[in-house]
């Protein structure tokens, strides 16, 4: 079984499948790994595409931002797909965003942009004109384009696109493959889409035990408390006993057993996102 002794891992393992090209765990590692693959391809002179997929939750990890920063500097060609199923980064998909995504990837637009900048730089006071144009463009993009953060880092941003729109995703992938340097495609998805129990309780189905397909309920309800249940009870009691006790979690409040503590002592509960290094040092500072 999955995630059971003697069974399959919950994460990619090369020894388990030839389709798993990288051993990893937890989250926030895909951009770093993808960048490494892309650079190795360039060093060896090979020719293949590299695509890294990362979720909006995993993007909160510091390692992901370190990789984005390095990717922008190295300018290796590879595609990053941001699977955003929590709408935590931008608003809903809109017609304007779709229009901008298509317009900005057109060859005519990219060629025109390069020609205009080259021409202006050759004119008297051209550099000042370019500077003013860039400032105006930046201000407009801040208002209209949800991916301005990535653009400022030096990574081409495409999207957002509806995750259920296969044609739209294929179109952006084809366009991204012709752009030099790292490209991020922002895909908006709905966790559990098409399966009502998962749509109602997405967190419960993040990592689940065997369940009945019709009801979504566990097939074998647990009788005994597990480690997480016991930890949850102990933390609640400690919080009751001592007002100096705080709880810090690196995302996944339910999985770490801190939901009850959070509900009872919200002012003493801190979810720092998937940022384990920060969580440890932050906790040390709190102590």
Model-derived regions, located:
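Cofactor-binding active-site loop characterized by glycine-rich and histidine/acidic residues
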Residues: 1-74, 227, 243-250, 258-259
């Amino acid at each position: 079984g999955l995630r059971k002794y003697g069974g399959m891992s919950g994460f990619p393992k090369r020894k388990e499948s030839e389709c798993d090209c990288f051993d990893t765990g937890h989250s926030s590692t895909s951009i770093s790994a993808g960048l490494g693959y892309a650079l190795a391809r360039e060093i060896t002179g090979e020719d293949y595409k590299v695509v890294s997929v990362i979720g909006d939750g995993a993007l909160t990890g510091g390692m992901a931002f370190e990789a984005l920063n390095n990717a922008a500097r190295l300018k290796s060609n590879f595609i990053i797909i941001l699977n955003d199923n929590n709408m935590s980064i931008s608003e809903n998909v809109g017609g304007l965003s779709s229009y901008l995504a298509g317009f900005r990837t057109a060859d005519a637009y990219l060629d025109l942009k390069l020609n205009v900048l080259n021409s202006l730089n050759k004119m008297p006071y051209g550099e000042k004109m370019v500077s003013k144009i860039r400032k105006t463009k930046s201000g407009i993009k801040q208002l209209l384009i949800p991916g301005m953060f990535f653009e400022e880092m030096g990574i081409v941003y495409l999207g957002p696109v509806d995750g259920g729109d296969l044609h739209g995703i294929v179109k952006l992938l084809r366009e991204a493959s012709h752009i030099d340097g790292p490209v991020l495609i922002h895909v908006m998805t709905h966790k559990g889409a098409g399966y009502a129990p998962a749509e109602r309780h997405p967190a419960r189905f993040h990592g689940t035990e065997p369940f009945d397909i019709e009801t979504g309920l566990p097939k074998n309800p647990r009788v005994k408390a597990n480690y997480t249940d016991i930890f949850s009870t102990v933390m609640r009691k400690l919080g009751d006993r001592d007002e100096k006790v705080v709880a810090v979690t690196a995302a996944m409040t339910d999985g770490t057993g801190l939901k009850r503590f959070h509900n009872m002592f919200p002012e003493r509960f801190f979810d720092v996102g998937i940022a384990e290094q920060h969580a440890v040092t932050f906790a040390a500072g709190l102590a």
